[in-house]
């Protein structure tokens, strides 16, 4: 059975997470792992660590409605705090830094 449109969570070996969505084509593709910034991820690991690298993928939400998936992705990024650079790799919904 194939998933429709989904929001997923990737967990990297260092425990940091990325929340993403797959709303393409006919639905979720098992080999789709999002559009996270690989330079941000790579800087957290040594070359040796990157040579044996496992990412866990969990489906958090599924819907037939792309707009609902878009909304849920934003909600889950905030809920899981994956937009906090200490916790995750999401670049959207980042808190604004206060300037003095």
Briefly describe each language-model feature range:
Residues 1-100:
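Structure-specific nucleic-acid interaction/processing domains
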